[in-house]
């Protein structure tokens, strides 16, 4: 089998992250990629001699870094809640924002009103922008549906976007993100729904690798959280 090599040259800096507590920046070097994997970082002349038929990519003085890994995102959503940012920055607690009609429930109402196709088209440019800015792996949580049909809608949109874009996407089912308004006074009943309906449904279509829960005073308590996580484990998450 013939190996395919590419040498990246004219790099101002290469960030190797060799050490756990520092970036490990190197200058005056080139990088060779062999069959899709970084094979060596060295002087350009040394790499060129070792790989005389390699393709060349002129980085034009750019910086080469590892791809960013962006965990805990809700990158498939409807409208922005940027109006809440000023409130949070000024010290208004999240629970107060939620009481005023903002927070997670605002996103839930928005996502429930949108179709799967709309979520895909709305979020494709957002994920493309993340990729342009250096993110190569992203975890995307659901949690803006809070009922089985809408959690599935979110996760199906995630799957379609993952298939369309050169991003590594890890999907997480977060149906236990908040108690929806219709279950506000029947919290254990909502936990039953998540464990007995939503998690099995997502697992049946292999829509999520992970299962998560928002354990926080005023939201899911320890016992409820344990139930959700154990149900996820039982279904391979």
Predicted regions located by residue number:
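Conserved beta-strand scaffold positions in the cores of enzyme catalytic domains, especially
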Residues: 7, 54-58, 171
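Short, flexible active-site-proximal loops enriched in glycine and acidic residues
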Residues: 96-99, 131-132, 168-170
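Divalent metal-coordination and catalytic microenvironments
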Residues: 11, 31, 36, 61, ...
């Amino acid at each position: 089998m013939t190996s395919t090599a590419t040498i990246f040259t004219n790099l101002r800096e290469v960030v190797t992250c060799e050490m756990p507590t520092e970036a490990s920046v190197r200058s005056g070097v080139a990088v060779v990629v062999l069959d899709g994997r970084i094979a060596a970082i060295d002087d350009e002349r040394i790499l060129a001699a070792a790989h005389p038929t390699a393709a060349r990519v002129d980085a034009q003085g750019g910086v080469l870094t590892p791809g960013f890994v962006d965990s805990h995102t809700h990158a498939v959503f409807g409208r922005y809640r940027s109006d809440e940012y000023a409130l949070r920055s000024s010290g208004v607690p999240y629970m107060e924002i939620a009481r005023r009609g903002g927070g997670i429930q605002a996103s839930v109402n928005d996502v429930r009103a949108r179709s799967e196709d709309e979520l895909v088209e709305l979020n494709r440019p957002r994920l493309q922008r993340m990729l342009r800015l250096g993110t190569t792996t992203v975890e995307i949580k659901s949690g803006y549906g809070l009922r089985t049909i809408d959690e599935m809608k979110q996760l199906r949109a995630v799957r379609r976007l993952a298939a369309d874009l050169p991003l590594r996407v890890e999907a997480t089912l977060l149906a236990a993100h908040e108690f929806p308004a219709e279950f506000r006074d029947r919290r254990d009943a909502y936990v039953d729904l998540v464990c007995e309906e939503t998690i099995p449904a997502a697992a049946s279509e292999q829509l999520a690798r992970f299962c998560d829960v928002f354990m926080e005073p005023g939201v899911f308590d320890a016992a409820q959280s344990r139930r959700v996580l154990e149900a996820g484990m039982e279904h391979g998450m």
